[in-house]
Amino acid sequence: MITLNDLRIIQTKVNLLPYKSDAENFGTPEFWARISELGSGDCDDYELEKYHRLILIGMKPSQLRLATCFVEEHRDSEGQWVPKKDRYHLVLLVDLNGITYVLDNRYPHPMEWELLPYEWHKLQIPGTQTWEWAANADRSFGE
């Protein structure tokens, strides 16, 4: 049985891998691959790696879904507000014992999704490659 500690271990190990934007890695704004295949990566690469590792330890695809969101407003290193389009982010949602946890490369530990100040955009339908708008999404995982 998968535990919260298993999520923490995978979150910690994957988050230790180096961050590098797709523009730096590939000269393109977006390229999705597991971070272990690249040696470094951005948010989608981290979360694909976590998804893969969770499947390897026995988690069902129906318990996992990728989600896009806009993260909280913040200032850049020069003190300027980061525009909304540049706050677009991808995380992994994990259903564990009826609680939805967010695995996010910006945080060291899994977080309950209700605690994050994100504006949810699209959610993957669990176990599929289909996405739905968050406003219309079934927030439960169901089997």
What are these regions (language model features)?
Residues M1-E143:
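A structural boundary/capping signal
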